[in-house]
């Protein structure tokens, strides 16, 4: 039993464009989710093509997730994945809602630089408990028919999915749910991000013909538009692109401007209703050159404003509404105290006593380590000879054999590199403890000291590995020591959660051999992903580290 669906249109409160914009950007389906997104790692594997949020200010949400394939070597082949789903539309009309979910997911892929013909789909379905009510059974059937219609219309297929018909608790039911995930393989060189790139760019809208009976895009028109956008991206004509969805043109233009704080001035004669109309299947393009297709919307501006419908809105004010909505739940703008700018300088050349044309790097891999391949690749790219050694701990004999193998490897190497991850699952109660326990083995400890003090070797660590260096005492003392109450450590972030993002770091001193080719004051943008990234130590030790007073132990920085 399939009931006839109803028509859904969002009703943003207010009369003026400004009133509707403020209500729209503060809507839970539109507002910033950055504080939630940063809890999930977005850079592991060193293959990320698009960060979740684009632009210099990392604020514009991307259309799709894109990363290069994890291969042993270099590649420009990448995979993209995007989703589509509107719970309000699905509640009103399951057939149309599922159809639009497929269209939305595929349109996001096309806007990101992938070809729609290369796409495959997978569905996540979730419906109320069906029981013996025919109208409830009709909801998943209508949704599947709508999704099937979209697959036939686009000529692409779903290759899997997951469904559940248990979305009820007492009197509560989940809304009819069919989330479409579209994925495709493409080239990183074709990938287009969502944020506006510069002022004074022409912005156009590519919109398909709408079927008046269903309110859905005509598939012949939709596929023709996909081809037009794909060809313009191939020719390098597109600077940025955004799929139009839930909040219409207004939402898309607003979010495109956030990442680089670029404004927009509307030239097209658009009504307030048209600005907020959900236009699934439509794509907004920022052009590098004149567009051979599409409707002219307007141009980007240096002034951080949004001008449309005879009104000129302050984008900074809209941005604050957008960011503050979920800030109490998922904070991400917490500022730490100001820190003193520290400067050091290189007083002696950082060169090893014994020159080696191709230094050997041993990379021990512990249970839970997850970035050994990209670490090895980075060393190989720099001219070193990396070797990965897997530490096995299934049996006591395995542990003993791994210790012996690592001892021999350290003897034959000039560098020991501790990669990142979650060694030992970050248990018990903290990171890096499995690695530190392993390196406190007397024989391994002796070999590490010989490498650093007698053979002028080096050690490095990233993430979990760097935590181990600190907890062992190798940073800052240059030797493995027993922990004490005043031993430095890394502790939980002040924001109270894991965070994954890009940050700017400043070189304060280049006395370390690792930074000897850098200049004091150099700024680097680096990826971070950690829950324990705050270095803490006694004030006296901190002063020693910045050479304001004499260190109580030899300091290695």
Name these PLM-found stretches.
Residues 113, 485-540:
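An acidic, glycine-rich "communication" segment
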Residues 198-199, 235-237, 259, 278-280, ...:
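Short gly/pro-enriched beta-turn/loop segments at secondary-structure junctions
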Residues 1-425, 438-449:
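Glycine/proline-enriched, intrinsically flexible loops and inter-domain linkers
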Residues 213, 240, 249-251, 469, ...:
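Short acidic/glycine-rich loop or secondary-structure boundary segments that cap or lie
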Residues 114, 244, 464-465, 531:
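Conformational gate/switch positions in structured elements
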Residues 166-168, 189, 467-471, 477-478, ...:
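Short, well-ordered, mixed-charge alpha-helical segments that flank or form enzyme active sites
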Residues 546-557:
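Single conserved hydrophobic/aromatic residue that forms the stacking wall/gate
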Residues 423-511:
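Cysteine-nucleophile active-site neighborhood
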